[in-house]
Amino acid sequence: MTTQLEQAWELAKQRFAAVGIDVEEALRQLDRLPVSMHCWQGDDVSGFENPEGSLTGGIQATGNYPGKARNASELRADLEQAMRLIPGPKRLNLHAIYLESDTSVARDQIKPEHFKNWVEWAKANQLGLDFNPSCFSHPLSADGFTLSHADDSIRQFWIDHCKASRRVSAYFGEQLGTPSVMNIWIPDGMKDITVDRLAPRQRLLAALDEVISEKLDPAHHIDAVESKLFGIGAESYTVGSNEFYMGYATSRQTALCLDAGHFHPTEVISDKISAAMLYVPQLLLHVSRPVRWDSDHVVLLDDETQAIASEIVRHDLFDRVHIGLDFFDASINRIAAWVIGTRNMKKALLRALLEPTTELRKLEAAGDYTARLALLEEQKSLPWQAVWEMYCQRHDTPVGSEWLESVRAYEKAILSQRG
């Protein structure tokens, strides 16, 4: 430990103790909050089913930075490199298109065996796994509909894909001893004025009920459903809207997924957490950064990321909220994107844990909003960075921007050879 870092740490302990915060306890609590990293940042959501195929479903990964992962071995190596630079507990979030098989596998035929390499890797790296059916980038999703499709056979194909995905998810949880959160997001919607908005939602309701009809052990698998405002090519109507999925999660008691980019630009999911928690058992968060639309930019340590973290900590939602990331930027080094976004999420959680929340609640209850605002602002200047650096040091990860040197070295030695 460097003398400078240790001195800063000792001073930070004193400063936070003066406002009633035990920094050692904050670090212990931070280790209770794993962040689920999304595999698809590493290859621009290409997957291994048809890596040369185009990305569909109203989403885009823009940019052509060299060195993207081309297969599972490269993707796992890249993830390991990123994870070495991120302190504290982590999980990995997989999509169905990241299966591994020597032969072509239809999506409604995926099985746990197609993900056994991921499970063995997760065991070796002490990671939990989360999962997602992939209802996009497929010939049977080309017309913009999947689980709400009017064609019975196509709709059944996607139902069977989601049912098969649930079994894969349960396999993850059973093998790794920690439940896998499986999130269902579909791109279903229409580009222009839609006359019948009801029928697709009726079909989606029935389809989802069939998907979750098989009883699985909640210690192994958790169902989540995710809404969206619009996507490219589905600007006028989205079947799985916020109201639809809020109603579904409430009535079926599934988890509800809130994605930071899936609402109107003036809406924030930090304000939705406390409302949704009154009605659903668990929440899944997709922390992202929408720039004018659901652009999935790399997560910053900005006001909304901080507000999301603060909601989790202030209301002690550690056991009811699952924190995941969802961004994919192909214009910068993809490993750096993972590191920047995940470290920022963890920084936000730490800052929330270092907040004098008890005192702030007292001021709010007393109607002293002047002192509340003053204290909220002044605590931003407390030396949280020194606490973060100690956390990095204890987890044998680089302090400050030192991690960038490792990324550059890996880029030169490994990524540059990929063409």
From Swiss-Prot:
One of its GO terms (cellular component) is cytoplasm. Mn(2+) binds at H262, D294, D296. Binds 1 Mn(2+) ion per subunit. Pathway: Carbohydrate degradation; L-rhamnose degradation; glycerone phosphate from L-rhamnose: step 1/3. GO terms for molecular function: L-rhamnose isomerase activity; manganese ion binding. Its EC number is 5.3.1.14. This is L-rhamnose isomerase. Belongs to the rhamnose isomerase family. Keywords: Cytoplasm, Isomerase, Manganese, Metal-binding, Rhamnose metabolism. It is found in: Cytoplasm. Catalyzes the interconversion of L-rhamnose and L-rhamnulose. It comes from the Bacteria. Homotetramer. InterPro entries: L-rhamnose_isomerase, Rhamnose_isomerase, Xyl_isomerase-like_sf. Its cofactor is Mn(2+). Gene3D superfamilies: Divalent-metal-dependent TIM barrel enzymes. The keyword Iron does not apply. It catalyses: L-rhamnopyranose = L-rhamnulose. GO terms for biological process: L-lyxose metabolic process; rhamnose catabolic process. Transmembrane segments: none annotated. It is an enzyme of class 5 (isomerase).
